[in-house]
């Protein structure tokens, strides 16, 4: 069938890609990000490619990764590629490249090149259509920018549900806010999935960027949070399932994200999501652990801080403070975990994480091979990173682990020592001790087992409680019994140790013995077994050193306290049973060290050993018993022999007199032994009972102890003994340095690695050891500094840097204690080393020492004097003088060798000057001479080598400045001022570009000007010139201070010098002033006022302010910033000084205008070659002065001063003011020919008057008005008007004075022949009336009469007329009824003026508007005084005005609106009724304005007034309704075209509706029937055009009537049904005469049907009357255009009738009539049924479709009747009818839900 083929063809056309349709292709490619659619559509691909490729090339320069796309999507071939011509595989490959480019370009989309490049993808490859997801997600991070808006505008309409959130914003073309995006991510899973997939893919391609990742992280985090919040449920089970689903959906994203650890922002985003999951979802411990492990696996240096925060949050969610081992190891590997944890702990809860780390540190103690974990543990408690309760918990973890460590195996000695030290730290720390005691008290720990395991004593613990726990007490040893026997057995086979255990630091068997000894503690049996080992040789202990030396080494080492105590105990036990013929003095040094231990238990046991030794000496029978181990204590070598042993007698004396008396104090105070040793060796024992030791004995004791320090191989006891001896500088004639110098050299020779190894083995601090070693050198040593220097000089790389630093530190410590002569010698030596050519720590250290210590003055002088000599020496390296003079740039030619010498010299000079600078040069004034010589040498040298040498100059100047500043504070300079070289200092200011040098030189000049002004002032001006061009523009605080000081100190000296020379100070300082004014624009804005104020204050405000103001005004004219500065400067002065300044200022202006200028030539450059024209200078100065009068504080200052009557200041002010006024008037009079100067003087005069109060101003004006010149009088009145335009004074005296001034103005109006003067007077009257008229209206009435009279608005001049009328308008507003006397003249003359203003060819818009302004004021304030005749004139003139194109409408319309609002309603209706004909004759505009006036009058007046004047209103409306008929009757003479009539009738209908609202039914119904009769029978039937016109107007009204009032007036339809039927019978849309009537009738019916709520149209009588005539209107559809009209107008009316009919019978009747027009065949009558024309059938089908759509199944109840017709129509000859019936069938099927095929067969 033809119709089927057509459908197929249309479908193919719809899906076609238009490959041959170039226009369609152009439209498809006209979407653009950067061009409008119209512009884009006109571009070809060559143009587009050129633009976009340019952007692409710029991108390639920014990022080389873009270059790969040049071969593909940006190749020239891409211009011809069309996606629609590619196959699926090619398109897929292209998509991959396009999406890769989009991901890469996303980070630069805010750059223009990127947008251009992206536009190529839009224009050529249409990525917004084919790759919509990737395109949107690329641009989405910029959702708030105009760029995203451009993208929205070109996106396809059919966006997928993924991006449905963008649809509303695409339609309205506004940027989406963030909240909807978050909401979509939370609720729309495809959207979030797409975003996540895009971000992960971009990250894998290394294309992710900050904008994308920050956007994604925020959206993803909030979405996850929102999803978890939304899944909250009252039922735990349901909530858990939902949360698990969310977690499972999020974990894969986190897994992918955390796997890309190099992309830090992606990883941090994942951390954020982890935090949200942990806080809002109840995660299981295994999930938390997995997340933790993923986090530590992902962190890098950049993300570790965020990772730790995330870890802390996750750990906080766990019920127990535990973390996986992998996480703990990762934290352990961090560079400084404690610092990083402390940084985050201040902001986040980290307690669980920290406690978990503590638990990790003490986990598997027996398996820990190193001390890394325990070191971290100690640091955690020392750094106090935990809170109080968490610290207690942490201590509990440590203590529990330590007390149960024996269950898992034996702790290493290192671990045991570490933990023992930590527990001792708990007990000793002031902050930790209370917490520790509380933890011990609250825990159920076995303290005994703890002490046993750690071999320490917990002094705060209560021992009895622990001992009660018998089971634990027995359990601990039982576990260890298995360890001790095996170890003991292995040691039993060891032979006797060949030498002392003190003979070497590393003895393998000793470590095993120490371990066995530690295990034996606690069991006497074990200790005895241990003591009897062969290797110890106990049986021969008195003759060989092995046995005792073992215990000495144990208690002297860094072992647990319990172990050391037991060793001491073993020693004291042995000594108590020893024979008395053995001298055990070898033990004394070690016991002395033990007596200074921090542990009281050790000190107690050491005191016991000391007492045992003392007892042996008491019991000794021989004076000199043999010394135990004298030749083998430190081995068989010379070390043992190098010890200076004491005799037994001497040692006995030492014990008796020095050591034993303080036995109890040693136990109580660890520092007591040090004091005793010091006092003993010094010979100043505090105990009066003990006799002092003789000098030889003290020397012997000192040598004895020192020799042990030197020979002892072990460094732990060596350090303790050295600490005791370093308290004593000398004893018995020898010095500490002499005795211990070998140790100093030995330590130096150890080297870095060996020293570190020694300290690590013995667990002592290398730094502490080095500090004690260098203390060996005492300040009383003759060449202490030189000795220290010799230790490290010459420098060797094997030297420990820390040791070198310690040596230099010692130099600094003792420097102040050595004599000055030795200081000088030492300083010279250090200086020599400092200048060595080396970068070694030796040179740096010497320099640092010299910088840190106070170098003697003579040495500094010698150093400084080396500089000029060195400079002279190096100049010999340059070329001959002649060559230097003739050289182009004076550059000294130097070889490489010379350059090295130059570099060395520069380094030397720098060091010397830095040394001087750091040595408080103010304390060494003798340096001044050398420094000035240095300054000269530097200047000379600078000119030779063409170098600024800024740093050296600033150092030299800074030192001189310090000396000079101190000299300023004394009566007499501290140095010889003859050495001052001011020229050099000035050169420093002028020739350097360094701000530091400039500032220092300026300060030095300032200082020198105080102490030696005669040497400085002759060179001051160049300084200020330079300051103006350079220094003043600086904005740092220091430069500000420099400038302030320079002004404060130099300027007063300069002024005083000029006065001493009897020179004019202003002229003399003109150069200075010029420098500052020229520098104004360079001075930072916030400093200008302060700087100039300081300058003027120092110069003298009264003498110099005028000059500064004038120079600024001359140079910068009316620059706003300059004016603000000038205002600030002037405002700071008193009123008298400010006025005096203005007098001098005006004198300067006058001087500049003279033929032979005086001071203005100096200050302003008048008359000079490069000076400006005097007139321009004068204008600038006068305008600036006017600004000053307006904006400075002179007005308030004058008012305040003048308030004090009879004061001297008030007299000065009056005198200066009078002088200024005279000067201004004189300038104005003499310069009238120079218009610019005259105007500027007028501005000044205006501003000057502005400084007066209103009363004083009027007094002055009255005097000036008496002067003869009209020009001055006009100017004065204009000034008064200007003053009144602002906010004049409102106080009562000012108001009365102003009203009293009115007669003066009235006199001018009535008598002056000068129109301009009159105009000015009227303007003043207007302002006075407006501002003050209400105060006393009676005083204004004469003025109103004068204005309304012949002398004002009666004049011929338009300016005075306009001003007068406007003044009358103001008076009407102010005076109200008081104006009635002037009203007759005012109205008559203003009406005449209105008529004059509209004369053809002479229209005067301003006069026209002014008169209407007066009418408006009268309507508002005096509406009752305007008579009917005046209203008629106003309205008639308004009609003329409305017809004029030259005049504006606003003022007239406003007057008419006010008449409608304010005038009596009867008067308004009356004037409209009387003048309606004239309004129509005047044209559409006049008619429209008249109707609008009528409408507003009805609206704004009450209902009662409308009812009262209803007859007149009805008469007006009937006239208005007849407008169409009248205009049609006029034919070609009509003034209204169709549009004008439509517009007028709309207003008439609106007026009628407003009237109806004010009436009731009984009042309106007669009017309606009258109107109906008027429309239907009120005109002869012969007048067909008149009849149609009236009916058209009537039905247009009814359309509005039924549409507006709706169901209220449905019953009124009964009046019009018959006439409607008649009209439908004769009116036709095809007849132009009746078309409008036909349209308005159908529209009226539609409104009437639509709003029927009273079943009016259900009535058969009504329905039958209207249904057939209405449906018959379908017959008018005989052409395509008529069919469209019928479908648009008749079909909706038919549909609304069917809805209103609302019954099956009525519907059947309607359908019967309607179906006639569906069939072309003849009916029974033989006549055509009505559907002969296909357009008619088409219209009828449209009616059926509308009815089906509106009524649905109600209408389809008639389907059986319709089916035959439908069958016929489906075979209709007309293709349009056939297509339309098929649409109707489809519509029916959609409604019924079943096919019609079976019914139609």
From Swiss-Prot:
The keyword Signal does not apply. Keywords: Membrane, Nucleus, Repeat, Ribonucleoprotein, Ribosome biogenesis, rRNA processing, Transmembrane, Transmembrane helix. SMART domains: BP28CT. GO terms for cellular component: 90S preribosome; membrane; small-subunit processome; t-UTP complex. Gene3D superfamilies: Leucine-rich Repeat Variant. The gene is utp10. GO terms for molecular function: snoRNA binding. Involved in nucleolar processing of pre-18S ribosomal RNA. Involved in ribosome biosynthesis. HEAT repeats lie at residues 582-619, 1045-1082, 1252-1289, 1296-1334, 1757-1794. The chain crosses the membrane at residues 945-965, 1001-1021. GO terms for biological process: maturation of SSU-rRNA from tricistronic rRNA transcript (SSU-rRNA, 5.8S rRNA, LSU-rRNA); positive regulation of transcription by RNA polymerase I. It is a multi-pass membrane protein. It comes from Aspergillus terreus (strain NIH 2624 / FGSC A1156). It comes from the Eukaryota. Component of the ribosomal small subunit (SSU) processome. This is U3 small nucleolar RNA-associated protein 10. PANTHER family: BAP28, HEAT REPEAT-CONTAINING PROTEIN 1. Belongs to the HEATR1/UTP10 family. Pfam families: BP28CT (PF08146), HEAT_HEATR1 (PF23243), U3snoRNP10 (PF12397). The keyword Membrane applies. It is found in: Nucleus, Nucleolus; Membrane.
């Amino acid at each position: 069938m033809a119709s089927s083929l057509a459908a197929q063809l249309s479908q193919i056309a719809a899906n076609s890609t238009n490959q041959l349709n170039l226009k369609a292709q152009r439209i498809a490619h006209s979407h653009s990000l950067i061009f409008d659619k119209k512009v884009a559509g006109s571009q070809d691909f060559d143009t587009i490619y050129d633009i976009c490729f340019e952007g692409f090339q710029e991108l390639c320069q920014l990022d080389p990764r873009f270059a790969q796309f040049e071969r593909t999507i940006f190749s020239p071939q891409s211009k011809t590629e069309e996606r629609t011509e590619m196959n699926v595989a090619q398109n897929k490959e292209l998509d991959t490249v396009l999406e890769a480019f989009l991901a890469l370009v996303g980070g630069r989309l805010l750059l223009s090149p990127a947008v251009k490049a992206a536009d190529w993808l839009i224009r050529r490859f249409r990525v917004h259509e084919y790759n919509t997801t990737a395109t949107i997600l690329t641009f989405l991070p910029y959702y708030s920018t105009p760029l995203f808006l451009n993208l929205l505008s070109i996106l396809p309409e059919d966006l997928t549900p993924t991006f449905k959130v963008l649809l509303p914003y695409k339609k309205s073309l506004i940027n989406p806010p963030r909240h909807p995006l978050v909401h979509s991510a939370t609720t729309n899973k495809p959207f979030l999935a797409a975003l996540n997939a895009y971000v992960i893919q971009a990250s894998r391609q290394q294309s992710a960027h900050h904008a994308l990742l920050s956007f994604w992280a925020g959206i993803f985090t909030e979405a996850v949070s929102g999803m978890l919040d939304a899944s909250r449920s009252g039922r735990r089970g349901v909530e858990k399932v939902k949360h698990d689903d969310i977690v499972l959906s999020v974990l894969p994203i986190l897994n992918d994200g955390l796997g890309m650890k190099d992309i830090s922002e992606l990883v941090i985003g994942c951390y954020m999501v982890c935090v949200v999951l942990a806080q809002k979802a109840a995660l299981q411990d295994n999930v938390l652990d997995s997340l933790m492990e993923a986090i530590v696996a992902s962190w890098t240096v950049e993300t570790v801080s965020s990772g730790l925060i995330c870890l802390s949050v996750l750990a906080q969610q766990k019920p127990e403070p535990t973390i996986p081992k992998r996480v703990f190891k990762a934290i352990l590997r961090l560079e400084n975990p404690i610092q990083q944890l402390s940084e985050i702990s201040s902001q986040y809860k980290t307690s669980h994480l920290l406690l978990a780390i503590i638990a990790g540190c003490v986990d598997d103690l027996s398996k820990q091979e190193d001390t890394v974990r325990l070191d971290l543990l100690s640091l955690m408690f020392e750094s106090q990173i935990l809170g109080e309760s968490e610290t207690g918990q942490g201590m509990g973890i440590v203590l529990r682990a330590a007390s149960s460590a024996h269950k898992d195996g034996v702790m290493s000695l290192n671990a045991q020592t570490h933990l023992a030290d930590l527990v001792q730290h708990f007990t000793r720390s002031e902050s930790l001790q209370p917490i520790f005691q509380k933890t011990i008290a609250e825990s159920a720990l076995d303290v005994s087992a703890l002490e046993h395991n750690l071999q320490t004593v917990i002094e705060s613990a209560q021992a009895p409680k622990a001992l009660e726990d018998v089971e634990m007490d027995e359990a601990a040893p039982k576990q260890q019994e298995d360890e001790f026997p095996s170890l003991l057995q292995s040691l039993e086979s060891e032979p006797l140790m060949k030498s002392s255990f003190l003979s070497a630091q590393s003895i393998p068997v000793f470590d095993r013995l120490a371990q066995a000894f530690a295990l034996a503690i606690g069991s006497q049996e074990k200790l005895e077994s241990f003591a009897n080992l062969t290797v110890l040789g106990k049986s021969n202990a008195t003759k060989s050193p092995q046995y005792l030396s073992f215990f000495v080494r144990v208690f002297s080492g860094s072992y647990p306290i319990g172990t050391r105590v037991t060793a001491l105990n073993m020693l004291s036990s042995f000594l108590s049973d020893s024979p008395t013929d053995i001298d055990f003095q070898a033990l004394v040094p070690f016991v002395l060290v033990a007596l200074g231990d921090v542990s009281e238990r050790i000190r107690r046991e050491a005191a016991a050993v000391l007492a045992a030794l003392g007892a042996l000496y008491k019991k000794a029978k021989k004076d000199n018993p043999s010394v135990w181990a004298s030749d083998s204590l430190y081995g068989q070598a010379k070390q043992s022999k190098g010890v200076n042993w004491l005799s037994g007698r001497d040692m006995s004396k030492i014990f008796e007199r020095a050591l034993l008396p303080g036995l109890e104090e040693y136990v109580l105070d660890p520092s007591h032994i040090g004091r005793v040793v010091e006092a003993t060796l010094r010979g100043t024992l505090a105990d009066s009972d003990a006799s002092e030791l003789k000098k030889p004995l003290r020397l012997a004791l000192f040598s004895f102890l020192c020799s042990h320090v030197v020979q002892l191989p072990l460094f732990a006891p060596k350090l303790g003994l050295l600490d005791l001896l370093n308290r004593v500088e000398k004893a018995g004639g020898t010095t500490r340095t002499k005795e211990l110098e070998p140790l100093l050299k030995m330590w130096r020779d150890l080297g870095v690695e060996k020293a570190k190894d020694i300290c690590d083995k013995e667990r002592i601090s290398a730094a502490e050891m080095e500090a004690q070693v260098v203390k060996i050198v005492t300040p009383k040593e003759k060449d202490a500094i030189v000795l220290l220097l010799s230790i490290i000089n010459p420098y060797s790389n094997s030297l420990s840097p820390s040791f070198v630093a310690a040596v230099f530190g010692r130099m600094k410590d003792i420097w102040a204690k050595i004599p000055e002569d030795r200081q000088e010698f030492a300083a010279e030596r250090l200086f020599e080393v400092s200048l060595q050519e080396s970068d070694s720590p030796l040179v740096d250290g010497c320099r640092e020492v010299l910088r840190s210590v106070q170098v003697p003055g003579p040495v500094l002088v010698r150093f400084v004097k080396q500089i000029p000599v060195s400079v002279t020496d190096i100049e010999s390296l340059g070329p001959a003088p002649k060559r230097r003079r003739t050289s182009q740039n004076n550059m000294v030619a130097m070889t490489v060798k010379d350059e090295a010498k130059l570099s060395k010299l520069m380094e030397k000079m720098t060091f010397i000057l830095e040394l001087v600078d750091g040595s408080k040069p103010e304390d060494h004034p003798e340096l001044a001479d050398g420094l000035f010589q240095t300054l000269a040498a530097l200047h000379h040298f600078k000119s030779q080598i063409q170098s600024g040498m800024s740093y050296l100059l600033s150092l030299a100047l800074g030192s001189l400045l310090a000396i000079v500043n101190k000299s300023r504070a004394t009566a007499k300079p501290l140095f010889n001022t003859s050495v001052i070289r001011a020229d050099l200092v000035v050169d420093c200011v002028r020739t350097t570009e360094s701000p530091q040098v400039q500032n220092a030189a300026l300060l030095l000049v300032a200082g020198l000007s105080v102490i030696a002004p005669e040497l400085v002032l002759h060179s001051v001006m160049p300084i200020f010139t330079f300051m103006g061009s350079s220094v003043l523009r600086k904005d740092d605080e220091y430069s500000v201070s420099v400038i302030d000081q320079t002004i404060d100190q130099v300027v007063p000296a300069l002024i005083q010098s000029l006065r001493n020379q009897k020179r004019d100070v202003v002229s003399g300082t003109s150069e200075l002033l010029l420098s500052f004014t020229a520098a104004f624009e360079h001075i930072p804005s916030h400093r200008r006022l302060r700087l100039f104020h300081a300058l003027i204050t120092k110069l003298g405000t009264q003498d110099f302010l005028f000059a500064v103001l004038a120079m600024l005004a001359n140079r910068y004219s009316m620059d706003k910033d300059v004016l603000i500065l000038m205002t600030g400067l002037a405002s700071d002065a008193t009123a008298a000084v400010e006025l005096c300044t203005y007098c001098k200022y005006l004198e300067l202006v006058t001087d500049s205008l003279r033929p032979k200028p005086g001071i203005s030539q100096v200050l302003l450059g008048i008359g000079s070659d490069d000076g400006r024209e005097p007139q321009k200078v004068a204008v600038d100065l006068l305008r600036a002065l006017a600004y000053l009068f307006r904006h400075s504080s002179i007005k308030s200052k004058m008012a305040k001063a003048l308030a004090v009557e009879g004061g001297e200041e008030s007299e000065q002010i009056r005198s200066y003011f009078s002088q200024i006024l005279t000067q201004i008037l004189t300038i104005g009079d003499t310069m009238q020919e120079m218009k610019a100067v005259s105007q500027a003087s007028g501005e000044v005069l205006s501003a000057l008057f502005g400084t007066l109060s209103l009363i004083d101003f009027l007094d002055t004006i009255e005097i000036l008005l008496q002067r003869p010149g009209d020009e001055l009088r006009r100017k004065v009145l204009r000034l008064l008007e200007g003053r009144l335009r602002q906010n004049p004074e409102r106080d009562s005296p000012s108001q009365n004075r102003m009203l009293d001034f009115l007669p003066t103005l009235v006199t001018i109006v009535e008598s002056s022949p000068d129109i301009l003067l009159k105009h000015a007077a009227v303007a003043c009257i207007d302002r006075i009336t407006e501002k003050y008229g209400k105060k006393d209206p009676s005083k204004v009435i004469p003025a109103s009469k004068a204005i309304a009279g012949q002398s004002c608005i009666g004049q011929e001049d338009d300016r005075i007329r306009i001003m007068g009328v406007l003044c009358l308008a103001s008076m009407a507003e102010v005076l109200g009824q008081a104006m009635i006397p002037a009203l007759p003249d005012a109205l008559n003359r203003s009406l005449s003026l209105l008529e004059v203003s509209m004369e053809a060819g002479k229209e005067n818009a301003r006069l026209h508007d002014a008169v209407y302004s007066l009418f408006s004021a009268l309507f508002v304030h005096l509406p009752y005084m305007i008579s009917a005749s005046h209203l008629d004139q106003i309205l008639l003139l308004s009609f003329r005005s409305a017809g004029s194109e030259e005049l504006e409408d606003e003022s007239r319309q406003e007057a008419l609106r006010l008449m409608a609002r304010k005038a009596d309603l009867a008067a308004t209706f009356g004037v409209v009724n009387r003048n309606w004909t004239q309004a129509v004759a005047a044209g559409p505009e006049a008619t429209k304005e008249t109707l609008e006036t009528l409408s507003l009058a009805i609206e704004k007046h009450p209902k009662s007034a409308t009812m009262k004047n209803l007859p007149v209103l009805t008469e007006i409306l009937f006239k208005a309704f007849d407008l169409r008929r009248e205009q049609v009757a006029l034919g070609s003479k009509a003034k209204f075209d169709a549009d004008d009539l439509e517009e007028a009738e709309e207003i008439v209908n609106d007026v009628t509706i407003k009237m109806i609202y004010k009436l009731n039914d009984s009042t309106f119904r007669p009017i309606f029937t009258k109107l109906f009769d008027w429309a239907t029978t009120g005109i002869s039937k012969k007048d067909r055009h008149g009849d149609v016109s009236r009916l058209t107007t009537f039905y247009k009204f009814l359309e509005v009537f039924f549409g507006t009032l709706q169901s209220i007036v449905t019953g009124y339809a009964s009046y019009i049904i018959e006439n409607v039927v008649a009209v439908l019978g004769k009116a036709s849309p095809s007849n132009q005469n009746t078309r409008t009537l036909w349209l308005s009738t159908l529209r009226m019916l539609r409104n009437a049907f639509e709003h029927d709520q009273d079943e009016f149209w259900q009535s058969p009588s009504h329905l039958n009357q209207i249904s057939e005539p209405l449906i018959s209107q379908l017959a008018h559809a005989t052409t395509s255009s008529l069919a469209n009209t019928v479908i648009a107008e008749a079909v909706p009316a038919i549909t609304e009738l069917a809805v209103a009919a609302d019954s099956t019978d009525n519907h059947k009747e309607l359908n019967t009539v309607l179906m006639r027009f569906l069939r072309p065949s003849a009916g029974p009558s033989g006549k055509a049924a009505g559907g002969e024309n296909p357009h008619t059938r088409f219209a009828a089908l449209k009616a059926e479709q509308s009815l089906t759509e509106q009524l649905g199944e109600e209408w389809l109840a008639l389907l059986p009747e319709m089916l035959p017709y439908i069958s016929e129509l489906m075979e209709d000859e007309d293709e349009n009818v056939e297509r339309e019936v098929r649409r109707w069938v489809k519509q029916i099927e959609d409604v019924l839900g079943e096919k019609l095929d079976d019914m139609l067969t």
